[in-house]
Amino acid sequence: MKKSTPAPSAVPLWRQQLHYRLKEGALIAFGALCLYLMMALLTYDQSDPGWSHTSSNAGQVQNAAGWAGAFCADILFMILGYFAYIFPLLLAIKTWQVFRHRHEPWQWSGWLFSWRLIGLVFLILAGAALAHIHFHFSAGFPGSAGGVLGEVLGDLAKRALNIQGSTLLFIALFLFGLTVFTDLSWFKVMDVTGKITLDLFELFQGAANRWWTARAERKQMVAQLREVDMRVNDVVAPVAPDRREQAKARERIIEREVSLSKHMTEREKHVPAVIAPAPSKPAEPSKRVLKEKQAPLFVDSAVEGTLPPISILDPAEKKQLNYSPESLAAVGHLLEIKLKEFGVEVSVDSIHPGPVITRYEIQPAAGVKVSRISNLAKDLARSLAVTSVRVVEVIPGKTTVGIEIPNEDRQIVRFSEVLSTPEYDNAKSPVTLALGHDIGGKPVITDLAKMPHLLVAGTTGSGKSVGVNAMILSILFKSGPEDAKLIMIDPKMLELSIYEGIPHLLCPVVTDMKDAANALRWSVAEMERRYKLMAKMGVRNLSGFNQKVKEAQDAGEPLADPLYKRESIHDEAPLLTKLPTIVVVVDEFADMMMIVGKKVEELIARIAQKARAAGIHLILATQRPSVDVITGLIKANIPTRMAFQVSSKIDSRTIIDQGGAEQLLGHGDMLYMPPGTSLPIRVHGAFVSDEEVHRVVEAWKLRGSPDYNDDILAGVEEPGSGFDGGSSEGGEDSESDALYDEAVKFVLESRRASISAVQRKLKIGYNRAARMIEAMEMAGVVTSMNTNGSREVLAPGPVRD
């Protein structure tokens, strides 16, 4: 049913401006205070008047901050000692944090402020105590090295724990206070430190490998030059007067010719590599393509209730062979030579050309480790003059090692080419995904329901957004809105907003991250509701539920909703209908994690753990594959991954738990890890342009309009779900609802105070109608619920002319 979405209440502009001005004023005040205190501390002179002593030279102050600065410095040194120098730095750190979040709305929290203040107190006490224990104070300063606080705490701790125990205690308190005061995550510090260490190690290792390679090449060149000199001296020797010397020279030449002929015979006996046939165009299109080529009999019926034709996509270009068997064999022989230069004996077993890359399957000699070949990937790329070389260590069912080398002329894999295949047409799942072609040019078709969730990551320009569009269009070409529904979350407000208005959407494209959290909460509540329905029906998954509902409808005995709560004996439970598969697409997962934070991670983990049987699936995409975004909790529950080109091996390991994604070519080149395996498949993603997406969206708009559910973005709890919806902060008064007056008018005219009646009349959700009835009860319009579940209308009816 069609529902209207009320406009969210916005914060008044004057309040926003006031918050920003107050925040700017606080920044200026704190910055000036930090500079003033540091200037006072650095120019402290004991001859100046202060709090701890008097001075006969009161008229002249040496401190650059003046009389007040001298007093402030004396107080800080007297109380904190050397730690007084750190105190302005702590204020500066907090000022910097406020500056970083200056564009966010100001939200005061007394509990959070108290927690930060406790952290500052721990910092000051622990720092002063450590200064007193480990430093000696100068005679030109008042008090001790740790001030009064440090002296008292340090002496007490030394008597109880000795110096070592006291140091350990105060260091722990100092780190705890620093974490609480500045929100510093030590796990993130360790991750960054480890990443820098690994990058430096790889840098030094690469430099060492280059040096050893250059050294070996120089040695080989010197040896070759010496051999040439020896040949010249042997062959072009001066005429010897002795006949015996001439005979020996002839024998040496004959021996060299015999050895050369033997070497040529061995090369001729070498078995050439088997070159696999090139990927040709599909032998025959799918039945759907042939059916769409037939002209429809009635123009009006060609749109209503049908899927968009694949012909609205750009057709695939005619494939032409851009190589020859001789060139492939030459590259294979060159590969053997280059690996032999690095001390690795191999032989090319087979060659598999593809649209983007060519895989050379090599057979290593006995005793050669695969790791030696993997470590030579960059050196091979340099030797072969290509952008990157990827080494496939394990090929299932074979004893060979794969070396993937990019082609000189790269072919474009069109999206229409993948959709026209029988593999896509014969797939029965409503959430079938057409990814692209594998290295051999065969289509890669997968089922999102079997994944059941997908994690996509890749840097900017790697083809990640095009891949997400291809997945969405795969669903739009496969199923109608009665079979699949979409919830799209687009923090960047650019990628997914193009799909606004298609009938598959359950709610408008979400760009506000607070609404994104509400959408995920609704998904969890819907998951719980579906599980309760399936438990009542005695089925185990969504397909079994839909089958049972369909059989009941075909038999003329539709099933009633067993979870419906009746308010009176006159209420009738609504009939069960087919439940569609729901796909939640998040384009930039990192932005949502940064803004909403931990609660989104928990919601996603809960959906990923349980939502498979309920027919709710996630597609999470991010261009920042770091461990603070793709956490262990998310990775553990989403085993299916898709890695586009990334910048480092660490990012590749974060996504697919192994290297390789950093050696991809970009522009849709990906490593796809199917469910149930740890061996990624290299896939060349299908290209879909923005114009094609627009054409598909317009075609679906002609076939229907969206049926939005207002409860999704309102963050409302579903009845009987057992899950706290956690709506927006503070909540809203139901009387401010845009439809509240219309609901009161309906109740007064019909004299029926029923939630279900209001729900059917206004075409809204159950929870919204219940809130309106409760608001009428608070306002005295209707009575509270009687024993039989009914209510009486107290207010008089409207006056009629």
UniProtKB/Swiss-Prot annotation:
SMART domains, alphabetized: Ftsk_gamma (SM00843)
Alphabetic keyword roster: ATP-binding, Cell cycle, Cell division, Cell inner membrane, Cell membrane, Chromosome partition, DNA-binding, Membrane, Nucleotide-binding, Transmembrane, Transmembrane helix
All residue ranges annotated as the FtsK domain in the record: 441-653
Pfam families: FtsK_4TM, FtsK_alpha, FtsK_gamma, FtsK_SpoIIIE
Transmembrane domains' residue ranges: 24-44, 73-93, 117-137, 167-187
GO biological process: cell division; chromosome segregation
Region (Disordered): 715-735
UniProt xrefs under Gene3D superfamilies: 3.30.980.40, P-loop containing nucleotide triphosphate hydrolases (3.40.50.300), Winged helix-like DNA-binding domain superfamily/Winged helix DNA-binding domain (1.10.10.10)
Domain notes: Consists of an N-terminal domain, which is sufficient for the localization to the septal ring and is required for cell division, followed by a linker domain, and a C-terminal domain, which forms the translocation motor involved in chromosome segregation. The C-terminal domain can be further subdivided into alpha, beta and gamma subdomains. The alpha and beta subdomains multimerise to produce a hexameric ring, contain the nucleotide binding motif and form the DNA pump.
Name of the protein in question: DNA translocase FtsK
Organism phylogeny: Bacteria, Pseudomonadati, Pseudomonadota, Gammaproteobacteria, Pseudomonadales
Gene it is expressed from: ftsK
